[in-house]
C-alpha cells in the first residue's frame, strides 16, 4: 500500500504526513528537499528528515469535520484514513464508510439518541450513503437486497475483543426485528431470545486471553430467517471453530473457559455435590496463575448463567447434568498415570488419581473399571481376533485429554442446539440474514496453535473480503464505464496455500507429524524449514530452532511450535464412545449417540486442525452463498474510556481488520474519485478556458486533464478517476498556480502601497512649505502691528498722567471742606440721640408689663386644649389599630363559601358604620377646634386692641410730657421681676411649640388612618366582587354536577338496549379512544360503551329499523327516506353555509328526533357520510363533507343538552367529567337558554336548548369522530403529496460550473438557474395553494383550515430538520442559502394566505429556520455558546446545535464552524443531560394527533343564520318539508 501511495510531486511548502513512533503519523511542512531526503518542520516543533518515499501529502482542503466515506478522501492513504477517523471520533461520529464497508469505533459511552425509534424510522428505506453512516444503514441494505433480489445476505462483524462487536450485533438484530415486524414469541421477540442466549454461550465459549478478559473462543453466526412477506419467521445460532485445545492446555496469564471457574465459585452445597474446590487444585486450571478477574465475581456470574439457562428453556435436571459434566472434566484432568506391571502399560498414579477417577465415573454415571480401561487400553480388531493393547502413561494422558476435549465439544454443541430449539427455526424459510461475530486477528508475544488457527480463519475471511471489495471496485468501474482489465487483484491465496494446501501445507504436515508417535515439535519444525525454505510467506527466525513465522495480510506473526502436536491431536476412540454411550445418565448418552457401523469398526486418526479446517470450509460455503456486508469494529484505546484515541493501536486494528487491505485494493486501481463538480471546482484554475466556454461538466473536466497532460487517469460518466499519486501532482500544480497568483497579487499590492506612500509624502511636503511661508508673513505683520501699538500706548499714557494730577488736587480740596462740616453735624446728632433714648426706655417698660400678663394667660389656655386633643387622638388611634386587626382570610372550602360571603358582607357594614362614626367624630372635632380657634382669635384681637390702646396712651403721655426728661431711678426689685417674667415667657413658648408638634403628629396619624381606611374599603369591595363570582361559580358547578350525574345514570340504563352505528369505521373508533387531557372523547371509561362498539350485528340493526318507533309515524319514515336521498346529492352552499348541514339540522329539530328514545335516522345519516368519504383520495369530496359535518356538529353543540333523570337525587362527584359522556356533554350548557322552538328560522343563538336522549348523544359522538377522521384524511393526503418534494427541497441541485463563470449570457442563465433551483419549492407552494383553494371553495371553517396548515408546516419543519441533521452534504453554506430561499417562498405563501387561513403556520418552521440561520450566518468562530443558544437558535437543543456545528462545512467561502471551545462546552452540557431520563435524540417527532376539541371548534365558529336557507328542489314541493321554506316578513 505504501508504494501505491508514494507521492510523486512533493515541493517545498507542501503539507505532508510523516511517520512518528508515538502517534503513528504527524503532520508538518516541507522546508527543504535534497534529492530523496526531505526536511520537514513537524507541528510538534521538531525538525525531521525522512525519505521522500516515506511521506504522504496532506489534504489541506479536507472538511473540518472529516468525510463520512473515506473513498471521498483526496488522498487515500494510512495517515489520511487515521486522521479522518480521529476527527469524526472527536465529534462523536463513531461510524464511517469505506465504500460499502462500515467502520465502527467503540465510543465507550452511551449514545442512546442514535439508536432510538426515530433514527430507525429515518434509515428505513433510505438509499445507502444518503444519510450519515450507521449500522442501521448496513442492516437496511441487507434487508432490502434480500427482499428485492430474494437472495440471502450476511453481515460480517469483526474486530478485536472490546471493540463493540456484541453491541453492534445487538443493534443489527434490533433493526432487523424492527423491519421484520414479528411481534412476540412466548412473550419475547426473536431478537431478545437470541440476546438472552449470549450469557450461556459466553460462559461456555469465552475465556480470558492476554488482551481481553472476555474473549470469544468460537465464531458465532446468527441466522435471522424471513418468510416471503419479509417478516421474521425464525432464527438460529451457528457456532464455528471452538478452540477445543484450551480445555486441556492454557498458558499464563490466560484462563480456561469461564464455566469451570463459575462452577468452582458455586454455593457450598453445589461444591460438595460435585466434590469441587478452589480452581488451583485442578490441573486443567492451574497451568496458569490467573484464577480470578479484577472487578468480576464468578459467584455472581454463576447465578446469572443459571438464570439465563432458565430463560433459554433448560430444565433444572438438564442444568444439573450440564454442570455434572463440567465437574467431571475438571476431575478427569487430575487423573495421572504411571507405569504398570506389564510392559508399556499404565495405571492410575496414586490414591488421589483414583479418587478423581472414581469421581469422574460417578459424575458421568459409568463403570469405573470401564473408564480406566478406556483411558489405559486400546482394542485392535483384526480379521482373526480382537487384541487388547495397553498404553504407556504418556499415551494414557493423551487419551485422557482427548476424552476431555471430546466431552466439552459435545457439550457445547448440545448447548447451541438447545438454544436453537428454544428460539425456533423456520425450516421453510428461503431467505435469511446472517450476522457473523468471530474473533479477530491475533498476534501476541507467545503465539501457539490457537493463534495459528484463528489467524488461518482470518486469512480465509480476508480473502473473501478482498474478493468482495474487488468485486465492488469492478462494479463501480463498470458502472462508470472505466477500463479495469489491467488492474491487478490483490490476493492472499499464497498464504492460504502455505497453510492448508494438501498435501504439503502446514496443517497437512502437522497431521502427518501427529500420526507418528515418535514425532516431536523439533522434527515438525525441521520439516517445515525444509519444505518452505523458498516460500516468500514463510520465515525462519534466526534466534530460534523450533519457531516459525508467517507473513499474514495483517503483519508477520511468529509461532512457537512447542505444543502444536499436543494441541492438534484429537483421536476418535471407540472405547470412549462405547463407555459414555453406556452411561446411566440420559444426558451423557445424548451427547454420545451411536456412531455409524463403518465408523465404529476402525480407529481413524482425527486432528483438531483438520476439524478446524472442515468447519472453516463450511462457514465459507455459507458466506459464499450469501451477499456479504462488512462491519469492522475498532477499539479506540485499551483504557476503555471515552474520548481517548490511540493512533498506534487503531492503526494496528485497521491492518488486522483488513481496512487498510481494502484501501490497498482501491489504490491498485483508481483510489481517487472526484465528481465532475468537485473536480472542476478544485482544479478549474489550472485551465480557466475550460470554465469560460459553455462546456458540460464532463467536457470541461476532460479539457482540464488534457491541458495538464496527466497520464493514467480515466473519465467516467459522473466522476474523474485518478491513479495513486496523481492527486498529489494535481495539487502540486494547483499550489504552484496559486503561488504564482499570490505573488502577482502581492506585487500589485506592494506597487499600490508604494504609490500611496509617495502621494502622501508629496502632499505632506507641499503642506509643510505652505505652512512655513505663512508663518514668515505672519511674523512680519506682527512686528508692524506692534510698532503702531507702541506709539498709541505712549500717547494715551501721557494724557492719563496729566489727568490724574488734576484729579488729586480737586479731591484734596473737597476732603478738607467735608471734614469741617461733619464735625458740626456730629455734635448736633449726639445731642438728639441721647434725648430719644431716655423716652424709648420708659415706653418699653410699660409695654413689657402688659405683654407679660397676656402671655401667661394664653399659655394656660393652649396647654389645656393641647393635652385634651392629644388624649382624643390617641384614643382614636387605638380604635383604628384594633379595627385593622379584625380583617380575616377567606376560606377556600366550597362548603364555607356562603358563610364567608355573609361574614364579608357583615364586616363591610361594620366598616361602613365605623367609617361614618369616624367621619362624625372628625367633624365634631373639627368644629371644636374651629370654635376654639375662633375664641383664641377673639382673645388675641382683644389683647392686640388693649396693646394698641396702651401704646396710644403712652404716646400721648410722652407727647404731653415736658421737653426735658429727667432720668428716673429704676428700682432693683422691678429689674428682677422683669427678668423672671422673661424666663417664664420663654418656657411657655417652648411648651407651646411642643404642644403644636404633638397636635401636628396627631393630625398626620389621623390622615394616615383615614387613607388606610380608604384602602381597606377598596379591598373590601374587591373581595365582595370575588365572593359574588365564586358564589356564581359554585352555583354553576353544582348545576353541572347534578345534571351530569342524572344524565350518566339515564344513559347507563338506556345504553344496554340501544345499538350504535355499525358503519363507523375502525379509524373513527380509534379516534374516539383518546385521553381526557385534550378534552376529547374516550371509550375506555365505561364498559357499556365497549358493548355498544362491538356487539352490533345486522340482525339487531334490522330489528331496530323494523320496530315501529313511538315518536315517528309512517309519514315521517317516508320523509326520512326522502331526506337521505336528498343529502346524497351535492347540494352546494348558500351564503357560505352548507345546505346539507342546515337541512339535516332543521329536519331533526322539527321531527324532535333529539328527544326520542329510539330512532334510526341518526344511523342512516352517519352511514351516508361514511359511504361518501370512502374515496379517500378525492380532496374535494372530503372538504365538502368536512364543511357539512363541522357545521352540523356546531349546530348540535349549541342546541343539545343532556336530559336529567326524574326521581334521581344528584350527587356531586368530581370524577363525573372524566367519563365519556361527562366530557361529551360538559359543553352542552355553554349557551344561554333561548326563547322558543318556533324561532327555528332565526339564528342558532336564538334557539332554546333541547334535552337530548341517548341516540342524539351517540349521533353527536359519531359526528365528532367523522369530523376528526375527515380532517385527518385531508391532512394526510396533503402530507403524501408534498413528501416527495420535501426530499428534493433539503439539498440544492447542483448547477453547471459554467453558469458560475462571468460571461455575456450570465444574467439569462442565472435567471433560468434560479427558476430551476426553486422549482421543487414552487411545487410545494402550488400544492398548498390548491389545497387552500379547495378548502375555501367548500367553505371549510377557517379554524380547521388554520389547524390543517399549522400541522402541515410542522410536518415540513420535522422532515426538513431531520433530513438536515442526518445528511452532512446538506449542512453547507450554499445549501443553507438554497433552503433559506425556499423558506422565503413559504413565508410569501403565508402572507398571501393571510392570518385567517395560515394562522401561526410560519412559526411552526422555527427549528428549520433557526438551523438554516446558523448555516448562513458569518463569523461563526466568534460566536459564543450563549449567543448561539439564546439569541441565534433559542429553540434548538444542545444535541441539535452540536450536530449542526460538527456537520457544518462551508463550500462557498471556506470558513469554519464554531470554535473548539464552544464544541467542548456543548459536549459537557450533553454529558450532563445524558444522565437525565429525557430522550437525547436530536430528531423531531411528527405530531399526527387531532389538535382541536369540539369546544374549540364551537368557540371559533361564528353565529350561523339558517332561517333563509332554501331547500333543494327534491324536497321543496313536498308538503312534509314545508317547514324548511323561509318565513316571509
From Swiss-Prot:
<feature type="binding site">
    <location>
        <begin position="212"/>
        <end position="220"/>
    </location>
    <ligand>
        <name>ATP</name>
    </ligand>
</feature>
<dbReference type="InterPro" id="IPR037975">
    <property type="entry name" value="MyosinXI_CBD"/>
</dbReference>
<feature type="binding site">
    <location>
        <begin position="159"/>
        <end position="166"/>
    </location>
    <ligand>
        <name>ATP</name>
    </ligand>
</feature>
<feature type="domain" description="IQ 5">
    <location>
        <begin position="834"/>
        <end position="863"/>
    </location>
</feature>
<feature type="region of interest" description="Disordered">
    <location>
        <begin position="993"/>
        <end position="1031"/>
    </location>
</feature>
<feature type="region of interest" description="Actin-binding">
    <location>
        <begin position="592"/>
        <end position="616"/>
    </location>
</feature>
<protein>
    <recommendedName>
        <fullName>Myosin-11</fullName>
    </recommendedName>
</protein>
<dbReference type="InterPro" id="IPR036961">
    <property type="entry name" value="Kinesin_motor_dom_sf"/>
</dbReference>
<feature type="compositionally biased region" description="Basic and acidic residues">
    <location>
        <begin position="993"/>
        <end position="1027"/>
    </location>
</feature>
<feature type="region of interest" description="Actin-binding">
    <location>
        <begin position="534"/>
        <end position="557"/>
    </location>
</feature>
<feature type="domain" description="IQ 1">
    <location>
        <begin position="738"/>
        <end position="767"/>
    </location>
</feature>
<dbReference type="InterPro" id="IPR027417">
    <property type="entry name" value="P-loop_NTPase"/>
</dbReference>
<feature type="domain" description="IQ 6">
    <location>
        <begin position="857"/>
        <end position="886"/>
    </location>
</feature>
<dbReference type="InterPro" id="IPR004009">
    <property type="entry name" value="Myosin_N"/>
</dbReference>
<feature type="domain" description="IQ 4">
    <location>
        <begin position="809"/>
        <end position="838"/>
    </location>
</feature>
<feature type="region of interest" description="Actin-binding">
    <location>
        <begin position="616"/>
        <end position="638"/>
    </location>
</feature>
<dbReference type="Pfam" id="PF02736">
    <property type="entry name" value="Myosin_N"/>
</dbReference>
<dbReference type="InterPro" id="IPR002710">
    <property type="entry name" value="Dilute_dom"/>
</dbReference>
<dbReference type="InterPro" id="IPR001609">
    <property type="entry name" value="Myosin_head_motor_dom-like"/>
</dbReference>
<keyword id="KW-0009">Actin-binding</keyword>
<dbReference type="Pfam" id="PF00612">
    <property type="entry name" value="IQ"/>
</dbReference>
<keyword id="KW-0067">ATP-binding</keyword>
<dbReference type="Pfam" id="PF00063">
    <property type="entry name" value="Myosin_head"/>
</dbReference>
<dbReference type="GO" id="GO:0007015">
    <property type="term" value="P:actin filament organization"/>
</dbReference>
<keyword id="KW-0677">Repeat</keyword>
<feature type="region of interest" description="Actin-binding">
    <location>
        <begin position="498"/>
        <end position="532"/>
    </location>
</feature>
<keyword id="KW-0963">Cytoplasm</keyword>
<dbReference type="GO" id="GO:0009860">
    <property type="term" value="P:pollen tube growth"/>
</dbReference>
<dbReference type="Pfam" id="PF01843">
    <property type="entry name" value="DIL"/>
</dbReference>
<dbReference type="GO" id="GO:0000146">
    <property type="term" value="F:microfilament motor activity"/>
</dbReference>
<dbReference type="GO" id="GO:0003779">
    <property type="term" value="F:actin binding"/>
</dbReference>
<dbReference type="InterPro" id="IPR036018">
    <property type="entry name" value="MYSc_Myo11"/>
</dbReference>
<dbReference type="GO" id="GO:0003774">
    <property type="term" value="F:cytoskeletal motor activity"/>
</dbReference>
<keyword id="KW-0112">Calmodulin-binding</keyword>
<dbReference type="GO" id="GO:0005524">
    <property type="term" value="F:ATP binding"/>
</dbReference>
<dbReference type="GO" id="GO:0051640">
    <property type="term" value="P:organelle localization"/>
</dbReference>
<comment type="similarity">
    <text>Belongs to the TRAFAC class myosin-kinesin ATPase superfamily. Myosin family. Plant myosin class XI subfamily.</text>
</comment>
<feature type="domain" description="IQ 2">
    <location>
        <begin position="761"/>
        <end position="790"/>
    </location>
</feature>
<keyword id="KW-0547">Nucleotide-binding</keyword>
<comment type="function">
    <text>Myosin heavy chain that is required for the cell cycle-regulated transport of various organelles and proteins for their segregation. Functions by binding with its tail domain to receptor proteins on organelles and exerting force with its N-terminal motor domain against actin filaments, thereby transporting its cargo along polarized actin cables. Involved in trafficking of Golgi stacks, mitochondria and peroxisomes.</text>
</comment>
<keyword id="KW-0505">Motor protein</keyword>
<feature type="domain" description="Dilute">
    <location>
        <begin position="1163"/>
        <end position="1472"/>
    </location>
</feature>
Amino acid at each position: 500500500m505504501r508504494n501505491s501511495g508514494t507521492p510523486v510531486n512533493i515541493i517545498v511548502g507542501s503539507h505532508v504526513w510523516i511517520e512518528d513512533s508515538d502517534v503513528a503519523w504527524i503532520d508538518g511542512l516541507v522546508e527543504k528537499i535534497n534529492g530523496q531526503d526531505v526536511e520537514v518542520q513537524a507541528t510538534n516543533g521538531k525538525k525531521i528528515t525522512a525519505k521522500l518515499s516515506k511521506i504522504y501529502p496532506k489534504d489541506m482542503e479536507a472538511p473540518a469535520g472529516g468525510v463520512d466515506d473515506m473513498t471521498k478522501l483526496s488522498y487515500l492513504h494510512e495517515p489520511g484514513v487515521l486522521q479522518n477517523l480521529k476527527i469524526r471520533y472527536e465529534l462523536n461520529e463513531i461510524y464511517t464508510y469505506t465504500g460499502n464497508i462500515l467502520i465502527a469505533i467503540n465510543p465507550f459511552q452511551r449514545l442512546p439518541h442514535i439508536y432510538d425509534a426515530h433514527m430507525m424510522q429515518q434509515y428505513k428505506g433510505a438509499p445507502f450513503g444518503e444519510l450519515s453512516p450507521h449500522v442501521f444503514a448496513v442492516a437496511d441494505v441487507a434487508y432490502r437486497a434480500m427482499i428485492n433480489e430474494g437472495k440471502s445476505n450476511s453481515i460480517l462483524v469483526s474486530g478485536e475483543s472490546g471493540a463493540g462487536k456484541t453491541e453492534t450485533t445487538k443493534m443489527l438484530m434490533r433493526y432487523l426485528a424492527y423491519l421484520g415486524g414479528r411481534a412476540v414469541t412466548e412473550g419475547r421477540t426473536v431478537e431478545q431470545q437470541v440476546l438472552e442466549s449470549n450469557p450461556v454461550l459466553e460462559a461456555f465459549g469465552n475465556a480470558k486471553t492476554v488482551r481481553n478478559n472476555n474473549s470469544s473462543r468460537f465464531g458465532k453466526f446468527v441466522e435471522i430467517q424471513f418468510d416471503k412477506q419479509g417478516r421474521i419467521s425464525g432464527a438460529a445460532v451457528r457456532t464455528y471453530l471452538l478452540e477445543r485445545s484450551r480445555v486441556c492446555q492454557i498458558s499464563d496469564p490466560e484462563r480456561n473457559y469461564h464455566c469451570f471457574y463459575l462452577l468452582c465459585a458455586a454455593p457450598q452445597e453445589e461444591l460438595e455435590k460435585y466434590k469441587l474446590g478452589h480452581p488451583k487444585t485442578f490441573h486443567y486450571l492451574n497451568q496458569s496463575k490467573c484464577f480470578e478477574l479484577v472487578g468480576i465475581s464468578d459467584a455472581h456470574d454463576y447465578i446469572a448463567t443459571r438464570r439465563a439457562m432458565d430463560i433459554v428453556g433448560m430444565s433444572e435436571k438438564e442444568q444439573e447434568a450440564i454442570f455434572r459434566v463440567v465437574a467431571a472434566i475438571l476431575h478427569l484432568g487430575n487423573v495421572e498415570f504411571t507405569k504398570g506391571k506389564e510392559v508399556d502399560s499404565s495405571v492410575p498414579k496414586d490414591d488421589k488419581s483414583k479418587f478423581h477417577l472414581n469421581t469422574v465415573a460417578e459424575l458421568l454415571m459409568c463403570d469405573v473399571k470401564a473408564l480406566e480401561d478406556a483411558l489405559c487400553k486400546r482394542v485392535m480388531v483384526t480379521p482373526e481376533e480382537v487384541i487388547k493393547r495397553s498404553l504407556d502413561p504418556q499415551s494414557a494422558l493423551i487419551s485422557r485429554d482427548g476424552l476431555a476435549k471430546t466431552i466439552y465439544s459435545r457439550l457445547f454443541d448440545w448447548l447451541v442446539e438447545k438454544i436453537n430449539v428454544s428460539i425456533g427455526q423456520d425450516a421453510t424459510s428461503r431467505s435469511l440474514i446472517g450476522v457473523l461475530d468471530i474473533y479477530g486477528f491475533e498476534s501476541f508475544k507467545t503465539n501457539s496453535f490457537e493463534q495459528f488457527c484463528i489467524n488461518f480463519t482470518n486469512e480465509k475471511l480476508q480473502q473473501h473480503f478482498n474478493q468482495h471489495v474487488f468485486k465492488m471496485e469492478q462494479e463501480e468501474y463498470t458502472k462508470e464505464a472505466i477500463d479495469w482489465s489491467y488492474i491487478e487483484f490483490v490476493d492472499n491465496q499464497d498464504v492460504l496455500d502455505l497453510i492448508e494446501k494438501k498435501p504439503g501445507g502446514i496443517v497437512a504436515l502437522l497431521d502427518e507429524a501427529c500420526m507418528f508417535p515418535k514425532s516431536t515439535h523439533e522434527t515438525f519444525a525441521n520439516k517445515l524449514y525444509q519444505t518452505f525454505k523458498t516460500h516468500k510467506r514463510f520465515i525462519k527466525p534466526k534466534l530460534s530452532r523450533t519457531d516459525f513465522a508467517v507473513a499474514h495480510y495483517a503483519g508477520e506473526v511468529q509461532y512457537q511450535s512447542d505444543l502444536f502436536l499436543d494441541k492438534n491431536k484429537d483421536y476418535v476412540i471407540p472405547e470412549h464412545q462405547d463407555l459414555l454411550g453406556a452411561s446411566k445418565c440420559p444426558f451423557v448418552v445424548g451427547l454420545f449417540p451411536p456412531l455409524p457401523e463403518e465408523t465404529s469398526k476402525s480407529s481413524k486418526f482425527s486432528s483438531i486442525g483438520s476439524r478446524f479446517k472442515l468447519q472453516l470450509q463450511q462457514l465459507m460455503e455459507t458466506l459464499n452463498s450469501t451477499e456479504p456486508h462488512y462491519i469492522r469494529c475498532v477499539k479506540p484505546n485499551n483504557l476503555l474510556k471515552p474520548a481517548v484515541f490511540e493512533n498506534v493501536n487503531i492503526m494496528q486494528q485497521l491492518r488486522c481488520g483488513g481496512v487498510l487491505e481494502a484501501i490497498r485494493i482501491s489504490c491498485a486501481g483508481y483510489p481517487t474519485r472526484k465528481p465532475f463538480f468537485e473536480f472542476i471546482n478544485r482544479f478549474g484554475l489550472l485551465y480557466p478556458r475550460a470554465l469560460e466556454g459553455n462546456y458540460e461538466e464532463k467536457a470541461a473536466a476532460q479539457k482540464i486533464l488534457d491541458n495538464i497532460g496527466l497520464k493514467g487517469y480515466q473519465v467516467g460518466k459522473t466522476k474523474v478517476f485518478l491513479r495513486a499519486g496523481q492527486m498529489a501532482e494535481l495539487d502540486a500544480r494547483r499550489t504552484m498556480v496559486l503561488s504564482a497568483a499570490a505573488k502577482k497579487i502581492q506585487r500589485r499590492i506592494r506597487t499600490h502601497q508604494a504609490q500611496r506612500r509617495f502621494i502622501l509624502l508629496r502632499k505632506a511636503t507641499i503642506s509643510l512649505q505652505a505652512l512655513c511661508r505663512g508663518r514668515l508673513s505672519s511674523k512680519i505683520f506682527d512686528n508692524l502691528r506692534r510698532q503702531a501699538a507702541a506709539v498709541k500706548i505712549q500717547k494715551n499714557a501721557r494724557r492719563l498722567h496729566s489727568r490724574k494730577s488734576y484729579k488729586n488736587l480737586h479731591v484734596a480740596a473737597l476732603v478738607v471742606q467735608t471734614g469741617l462740616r461733619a464735625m458740626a453735624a456730629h455734635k448736633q446728632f449726639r445731642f438728639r440721640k441721647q434725648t430719644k433714648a431716655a423716652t424709648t426706655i420708659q415706653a418699653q417698660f410699660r409695654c413689657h408689663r402688659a405683654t407679660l400678663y397676656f402671655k401667661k394667660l394664653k399659655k394656660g389656655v393652649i396647654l389645656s386644649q393641647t393635652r385634651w386633643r392629644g388624649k382624643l387622638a390617641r384614643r382614636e388611634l387605638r380604635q383604628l389599630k384594633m379595627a385593622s386587626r379584625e380583617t380575616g382570610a377567606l376560606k377556600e372550602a366550597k362548603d364555607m363559601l356562603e358563610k364567608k360571603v355573609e361574614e364579608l358582607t357583615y364586616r363591610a357594614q361594620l366598616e361602613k358604620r365605623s367609617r361614618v362614626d369616624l367621619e362624625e367624630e372628625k367633624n365634631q372635632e373639627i368644629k371644636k377646634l374651629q370654635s376654639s380657634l375662633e375664641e383664641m382669635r377673639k382673645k388675641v384681637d382683644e389683647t392686640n386692641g388693649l396693646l394698641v390702646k396702651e401704646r396710644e396712651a403712652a404716646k400721648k403721655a410722652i407727647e404731653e410730657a415736658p421737653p426735658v426728661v429727667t432720668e428716673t431711678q429704676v428700682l432693683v426689685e422691678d429689674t428682677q421681676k422683669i427678668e423672671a417674667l422673661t424666663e417664664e415667657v420663654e418656657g411657655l413658648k417652648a411648651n407651646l411649640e411642643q404642644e403644636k408638634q404633638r397636635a401636628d403628629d396627631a393630625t398626620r396619624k389621623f390622615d394616615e388612618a383615614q387613607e388606610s381606611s380608604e384602602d381597606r374599603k377598596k379591598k373590601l369591595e374587591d373581595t365582595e366582587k370575588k365572593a359574588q363570582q365564586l358564589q356564581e361559580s359554585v352555583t354553576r358547578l353544582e348545576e353541572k354536577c347534578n345534571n351530569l350525574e342524572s344524565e350518566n345514570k339515564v344513559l347507563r340504563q338506556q345504553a344496554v338496549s340501544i345499538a350504535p352505528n355499525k358503519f363507523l369505521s375502525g379509524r373513527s373508533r380509534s379516534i374516539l379512544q383518546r385521553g381526557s387531557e385534550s378534552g376529547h372523547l374516550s371509550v375506555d371509561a365505561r364498559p357499556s360503551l365497549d358493548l355498544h362498539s362491538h356487539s352490533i350485528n345486522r340482525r339487531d340493526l334490522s330489528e331496530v329499523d323494523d320496530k315501529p318507533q313511538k315518536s315517528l309515524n309512517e309519514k315521517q319514515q317516508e320523509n326520512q327516506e326522502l331526506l337521505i336521498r336528498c343529502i346524497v346529492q351535492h347540494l352546494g352552499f348558500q351564503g357560505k353555509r352548507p345546505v346539507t348541514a342546515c337541512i339535516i339540522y332543521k329536519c331533526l329539530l322539527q321531527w324532535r328526533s333529539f328527544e326520542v328514545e329510539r330512532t334510526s335516522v341518526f344511523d342512516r345519516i352517519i352511514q351516508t357520510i361514511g359511504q361518501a368519504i370512502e374515496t379517500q383520495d378525492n380532496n374535494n369530496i372530503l372538504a365538502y363533507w368536512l364543511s357539512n359535518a363541522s357545521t352540523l356538529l356546531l349546530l348540535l353543540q349549541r342546541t343539545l343538552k343532556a336530559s336529567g333523570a326524574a326521581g334521581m337525587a344528584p350527587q356531586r362527584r368530581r370524577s363525573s367529567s372524566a367519563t365519556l359522556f361527562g366530557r361529551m356533554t360538559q359543553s352542552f350548557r355553554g349557551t344561554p337558554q333561548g326563547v322558543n322552538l318556533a324561532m327555528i328560522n332565526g339564528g342558532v343563538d336564538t334557539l332554546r336548548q333541547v334535552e337530548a336522549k341517548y341516540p342524539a348523544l351517540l349521533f353527536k359522538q359519531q359526528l365528532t369522530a367523522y369530523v376528526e377522521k375527515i380532517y385527518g384524511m385531508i391532512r394526510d393526503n396533503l402530507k403524501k403529496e408534498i413528501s416527495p418534494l420535501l426530499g428534493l427541497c433539503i439539498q440544492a441541485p447542483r448547477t453547471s460550473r459554467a453558469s458560475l463563470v462571468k460571461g455575456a449570457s450570465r444574467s439569462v442563465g442565472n435567471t433560468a438557474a434560479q427558476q430551476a433551483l426553486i422549482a421543487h419549492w414552487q411545487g410545494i407552494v402550488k400544492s398548498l395553494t390548491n389545497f387552500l383553494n379547495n378548502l375555501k371553495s367548500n367553505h371549510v371553517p377557517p379554524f380547521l383550515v388554520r389547524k390543517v396548515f399549522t400541522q402541515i408546516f410542522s410536518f415540513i419543519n420535522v422532515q426538513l430538520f431531520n433530513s438536515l441533521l442526518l445528511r452532512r452534504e446538506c449542512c453547507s453554506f450554499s445549501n443553507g442559502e438554497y433552503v433559506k430561499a425556499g423558506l422565503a417562498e413559504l413565508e410569501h405563501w403565508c402572507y398571501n394566505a393571510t392570518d385567517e387561513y395560515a394562522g401561526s403556520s410560519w412559526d411552526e418552521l422555527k427549528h428549520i429556520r433557526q438551523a438554516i440561520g446558523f448555516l448562513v450566518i458569518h463569523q461563526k468562530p466568534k460566536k459564543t455558546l450563549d449567543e448561539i443558544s439564546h439569541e441565534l437558535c433559542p429553540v434548538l437543543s444542545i444535541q441539535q446545535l452540536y450536530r449542526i456545528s460538527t456537520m457544518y462545512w462551508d463550500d462557498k467561502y471556506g470558513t469554519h464552524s464554531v470554535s473548539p471551545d464552544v464544541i467542548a462546552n456543548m459536549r459537557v452540557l450533553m454529558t450532563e443531560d445524558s444522565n437525565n431520563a429525557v430522550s437525547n435524540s436530536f430528531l423531531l417527532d411528527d405530531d399526527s394527533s387531532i389538535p382541536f376539541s369540539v369546544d374549540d371548534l364551537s368557540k371559533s365558529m361564528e353565529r350561523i343564520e339558517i332561517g333563509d336557507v332554501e331547500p333543494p328542489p327534491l324536497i321543496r314541493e313536498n308538503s312534509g318539508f314545508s317547514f324548511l321554506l323561509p318565513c316571509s316578513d
